[in-house]
């Protein structure tokens, strides 16, 4: 299993790459974006020393996520990505080819756990 922590300005989230019932899934949640559709993209390098400017070229389009009116996206996507090949690379959240936030994909400790999704109610809490 792999995990990517996103924490850039007000954009925060946790994205997991893991096998679920024999298929690889991308699971997690992101908060802090404006309502709309965004892309999850794996990039060549896991170098975030200069923010999302140093992560290299896009390599793999994972899929689109939808951010609701409260600024929350719940991620549940199928993927054909071999998880072992993306460790150490970067994942970006992008819109119209602009990288808005990114993080490095790392190995996650494998244990039985429940994925806790970031939630927000109608009052923004």
UniProtKB/Swiss-Prot annotation:
Which pairs are disulfide-linked? 52-102
Q: What is its main location?
A: virion
Task: Name where it's found.
Answer: Virion; Host cytoplasm
- Keywords assigned by UniProt? Disulfide bond, Host cytoplasm, Virion
At the top level, the lineage of the source is Viruses
Q: What biological process terms from GO does the record include? A: superoxide metabolic process
The record's comment on protein family reads: Belongs to the Cu-Zn superoxide dismutase family.
Function recorded in the entry: Superoxide dismutase-like protein with no enzymatic activity.
Name of the protein described by the UniProt record: Cu-Zn superoxide dismutase-like protein OPG175
């Amino acid at each position: 299993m792999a995990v990517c922590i996103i924490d850039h300005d007000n954009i925060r989230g946790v994205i997991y790459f893991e096998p679920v019932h024999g298929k690889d899934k991308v699971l997690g949640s992101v908060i802090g974006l404006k309502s709309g559709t965004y892309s999850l993209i794996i990039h060549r390098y896991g170098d975030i020393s200069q923010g999302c400017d140093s992560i290299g070229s896009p390599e793999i389009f994972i899929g689109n996520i939808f951010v609701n009116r409260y600024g929350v996206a719940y991620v549940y996507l199928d993927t054909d990505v071999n998880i072992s090949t993306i460790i150490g690379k970067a994942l970006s959240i992008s819109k119209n080819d602009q990288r808005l936030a990114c993080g490095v994909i790392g190995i996650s400790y494998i244990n039985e756990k429940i994925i806790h999704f970031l939630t927000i109610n109608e009052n923004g809490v």
